[in-house]
């Protein structure tokens, strides 16, 4: 399909994402990319450790992870996400959308863009939900 006749702009979107990613990675350089990866890892593991301190919430202690992990919640993940959204936090992915038996499981991703204070606020809001 020629771009002029295409009914979708998927090719343009893919091109723009590829270009933005290339620019970002080239600006970071080899050492910068490693630093970003280490930040992702450290922040995600900090978040997981803090989540484990909230009553009723648990990150699988034996499953290794980089910057995404599954959290077992004491209530359905959809309710957790509603509570988080009420506090201006976009929660994790509700695994029950793909696996109905995982109703209380939430997939959380932490990146270099998340500050420590944002992670701490997230933990505080989770703690409020577990107190209710």
Feature map (PLM): residue ranges:
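Active-site C-terminal subdomain of aminotransferase-like
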Residues: 1-55, 59-62
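Short, glycine-/Ser/Thr-/acidic-enriched flexible segments
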Residues: 15-17, 23-30, 74-77, 96-98, ...
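Generic non-transmembrane alpha-helical segments
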Residues: 46-54, 79-89, 125-129
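Conserved PLP-binding catalytic core of the aspartate aminotransferase-like
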Residues: 56-87
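Conserved PLP cofactor-binding pocket of PLP-dependent enzymes
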Residues: 62-64, 86-107
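PLP-dependent enzyme catalytic core of the Aspartate aminotransferase-like
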Residues: 97-132
